[in-house]
């Protein structure tokens, strides 16, 4: 059994503690029932820790390949440590799958760095323990910066979506107002047409009465002329 003062065991204990923190955050997330931005922020925080844990596991794996000779780690202990890393990575993958991280595939695609365990081993093959720690912190810092940029992109996209939604709402309101104005204009036009029809009908009726009156006057005048001719001839 390795001593707790062993650098590898210290690193593993840190990774194990981080894994326990992630499990606790997942339990709180599932119990809270949060939705919307709050749920997204909590999920982002969990993904951030999972990404850091993945880097720590890669570092632990690389340290197993390059163990200082003075530590004299037996083959049995080496296999035990490999199993410990494998089990912890398996549990981490399960949590990542629950957050749709696809076993850290999203981490690589988002940051544009496909740093697989074999790649990490090759990069640290010539480093001492201090160099490996520095390399690990550099990778973690780069991933943190990538997460911050991703969050900025998400917020920018959200603001654009809100602006587009406001513009669509305004356009819809303008169209509704235009429809209302068209309805009012159509109603007024119908009333004007009805009034014109009544006026036309009244004018036709007035013309008929005038014609009858002129006819009566004509007949009376003709009768008067005939009477005068008969009387004086």
UniProtKB/Swiss-Prot annotation:
It comes from the Eukaryota. Residues 137-199 form the t-SNARE coiled-coil homology domain. CDD domains: SNARE_Qc. Pfam families: SNARE. The chain crosses the membrane at residues 210-230. Residues 1-209 are cytoplasmic. SMART domains: t_SNARE (SM00397). One of its GO terms (cellular component) is Golgi apparatus. GO terms for molecular function: SNAP receptor activity. It is a single-pass type IV membrane protein. One of its GO terms (biological process) is intracellular protein transport. Vesicle trafficking protein that functions in the secretory pathway. SYP51 and SYP52 may have redundant functions. Belongs to the syntaxin family. Interacts either with VTI11 and SYP21, or with VTI11 and SYP22 in the prevacuolar compartment, or with VTI12 and SYP61 in the trans-Golgi network to form t-SNARE complexes. This is Syntaxin-52. It comes from Arabidopsis thaliana.
